[in-house]
Design a protein with these regions (language model features):
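Membrane-interface loop-to-helix entry segments
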Residues: 46, 135-183, 196-197, 214, ...
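Hydrophobic transmembrane alpha-helices that form the core helical bundles
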Residues: 59-144, 291-304, 349-373
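Loop-to-transmembrane helix boundary motifs in multi-pass membrane proteins
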Residues: 2, 7-18, 89, 133-141, ...
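Membrane-water interface regions at transmembrane-helix termini and the short interhelical loops
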Residues: 34-41, 70, 94, 142-165, ...
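C-terminal membrane-solvent junction of multi-pass transporters and transport-like membrane proteins
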Residues: 320-334, 368-415, 439-444
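TM-loop-TM module centered on a large, flexible mid-protein loop between adjacent transmembrane helices
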Residues: 81-82, 88, 120-125, 242-295, ...
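Membrane-interface "cap" regions at the ends of multi-pass membrane proteins
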Residues: 1-78, 397-399, 432-444
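Helix-loop-helix junctions that connect adjacent transmembrane segments
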Residues: 5, 47, 127-134, 163-283
Length: 444
């Protein structure tokens, strides 16, 4: 059975939703809450090295996705659809399940990060009433509201909200770059005296900030809702990846010249001390970026799950039919949205997904490595029907695959091994129930 293609009222999106979903996730929670810590710890050149290493993964992946997306129409499920139609449904479903859980947990990650924008409120309550409020007083209502909007209204309302919050994110970044501090007038920073310090902590810091760059494929999950995926996916994904990289380089410079290493490390909202009107605009920008990332994940995760159900990936037919079914009038993955939002709510109630964030990175890296491997293999063993209108180079895809796997083990070897072990178990279960499906031979 083919992947689910969402048709009806929600179909017909152009390139903009792909680009804005990706760029809002790239310039999201990690930028506002953790990037100052990264630059304060590693210095200017350490930050540049993070950008280079991260984009040795993301640029080849963006090119690989663009190549695969222009070979044939990408239906609902985005990355899952691409992988399953190249590696076969069993291996595709194995990676698809990992990808779905990463996307669903990401909703919770961004909702929890959203509550950090209310830090002044929590501090005021503690000072005024001597009461320490749990972050869930904000995160749970937000998660409930987000769930209701997506389940009842679908992608159209999500895209409209996305445009609004991305606009606010853009304003906050402009005011950040326009701001100045006393430190910036006395630092005397030049590229000649820029530092790369605490090199032993490089991969520890890299693990904290790398999830920001996993946002480059966020818009691909809207594939079934796009008017022309073969055009919108390459333009939106590559555009967001390259623009995000350029913006981060300028942010590294701005942070380095505007605040001392100590302030960068100790003040997680250091950008509010630099931006014009930062006490207001940076919390608003943080709220906008995290909310837009949560909206993006909440739109994409159900579409991955719907495509998995449409491909009969679960052992029980009733479950497949329930999850694969779209809303009658427009094909919206309403049932899959309920499941995705329920999983996200569970982690929101836990209140802390820092440890889970590393697992999320592992599964995203597995997905990126798989996409690069598919692109690489197709350069040497593809069928005559493999004729993408956009072509990457085989060695670029190979670099993306190797660096993805290497980075997994450098970030956290036990987590990397655990991710592979979980996926092997999932594959064995799927293969047991679907022995008739092709595996790797599907690519040749």
């Amino acid at each position: 059975m083919s992947g689910v293609s969402i048709k009806g009222k929600t179909s017909g999106f152009g390139t903009a939703p792909v680009f804005f979903t990706a760029i809002a996730t790239i310039l999201g929670a990690i930028l506002f809450l953790r990037f100052g810590f990264a630059i304060g710890t590693l210095g200017f050149w350490g930050g540049i090295m993070i950008i280079i290493l991260a984009h040795l993964v993301t640029i080849p992946t963006a090119l690989a996705i663009s190549e695969l997306a222009t070979n044939k129409r990408v239906e609902g499920g985005g990355e899952y659809f691409i992988i399953s139609r190249s590696f076969g449904l069993n291996i595709g479903a194995t990676i698809g399940f990992a990808l779905f859980f990463s996307q669903a947990i990401s909703i919770a990650f961004y909702v929890i990060a959203f509550t950090e924008a209310f830090e002044p409120f929590f501090n005021w309550v503690q000072t005024r009433y001597d009461v320490i409020l749990p972050r869930q007083v904000i995160s749970v209502p937000v998660m409930l509201l987000l769930s209701l909007l997506l389940i009842l209204r679908g992608a159209n309302i999500g895209i409209k909200a996305l445009y609004a919050v991305v606009s606010l994110l853009g304003v906050s970044l402009v005011l950040f770059f326009a701001g100045s501090t006393d430190y910036s007038t006395t630092t005397g920073f030049t590229l000649g005296n820029a530092q790369f310090r605490n090199t032993d902590d490089f991969f520890y810091v890299f693990a904290i900030v790398f999830p920001a760059f996993t946002g480059m494929t966020a818009g691909v999950g809207l594939s079934g809702d796009l008017k022309n995926p073969a055009r919108s996916i390459p333009m939106g994904t590559i555009g967001a990846t390259l623009i995000g990289m350029i913006v981060y380089v300028f942010i590294i410079y701005k942070l380095t010249v505007s605040a001392s290493p100590e302030d960068l490390v100790n003040n997680q909202l250091i950008m509010s001390k630099i931006a014009i009107g930062g006490a207001i605009i940076i919390p608003l920008g943080l709220a906008a970026s995290t909310l837009s990332s949560a909206i993006g994940s909440a739109m994409i995760a159900p579409r991955t799950l719907q495509a998995l159900g449409g491909d009969q990936s679960f052992p029980m037919k009733r479950v497949n039919n329930f999850l694969g079914r779209g809303r009658h009038q427009d094909g919206e993955p309403q049932n899959a949205s309920i499941v995705a939002c329920t999983i996200a709510m569970f982690f929101v109630l836990l209140g802390n997904v820092n440890a889970v964030a590393e697992v999320i990175s592992m599964f995203f890296l597995v997905t990126y490595g798989s996409l690069n491997l598919i692109s690489f293999l197709n350069h040497f063993g593809s069928s005559p029907s493999y004729r993408p209108s956009f072509k990457s180079k085989w060695y670029i895809s190979l670099i993306g695959f190797v660096v993805s796997i290497w980075v997994m083990f450098k970030i956290n070897t036990p987590y990397a091994l655990s991710a592979y072990l979980i996926m092997v178990i999932i594959y064995l279960i799927i293969n047991y129930y679907h022995k008739d499906r092709k595996g790797l031979e599907a690519i040749f």
